[in-house]
Amino acid sequence: MNSQNALSNMRLAVRGDISGNSTLVLKKIRFYNCAIIYLRNAQLLVKTIDGGVINIPAESICYIEKNTVIDVTLNVLGKGMPYDIFHIDNNILSCICKVMEPLLLNPHKIGPMRSRIFNCMADKTDTEIFKMITEANVPNHRLIYNITYLLSKVDDIESLVCSLSVSTDSTFTEKLKLIIESDLSKSWRLVDLANVLHMSEVSIRKKLEKENNNFNN
């Protein structure tokens, strides 16, 4: 399943009274937005498309960069909701990036094999702040500073800021999404998008392929 919704919906499978040692596996999850995950009663094993493996323990906060594709294994360790997830929209992300940019002291030190997933242990204050950002109708300024606080706990702060900066750039997939969302009553075909963008259908497909995406008429 190639969607960040898979990870959000995975919470439905573990609602209610779940005994420990339950395991859930999802393949090729794409995060179309940056996400912060709070692991409450679970351990998350992440495998990236380049073969890297990241083991994230319970009582941790994890940040995942936009457009990251991963396989996940969730080991549920106790009863109740094992984790919560918060997706950061692009407007909020841009503001967070501006706040944290001064922390990027040596941008040239960040190599091509930079990290896209970050995590840190969460204390009581962190869990309370995470709960606040997931509440309804939180003012944007509070979201920005609360998320910034959580992200500032990461050890490799310069790599994190670089990741935030990369994620603020709009992808071709996002541009297509905005066009489609401008008129949801329309059954969009590839030829329609080609007309709007003044591009050939072949060019659109190639750009999507570069982002590991496709368009199904």
Predicted feature locations:
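Non-catalytic effector/regulatory segments
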Residues: 12-16, 37-39, 63, 90-93, ...
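Aromatic/histidine-rich interaction motifs
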Residues: 102-127
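Acidic, glycine-rich flexible loop segments
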Residues: 130-133
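Key DNA-contact positions within bacterial/archaeal DNA-binding proteins
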Residues: 202
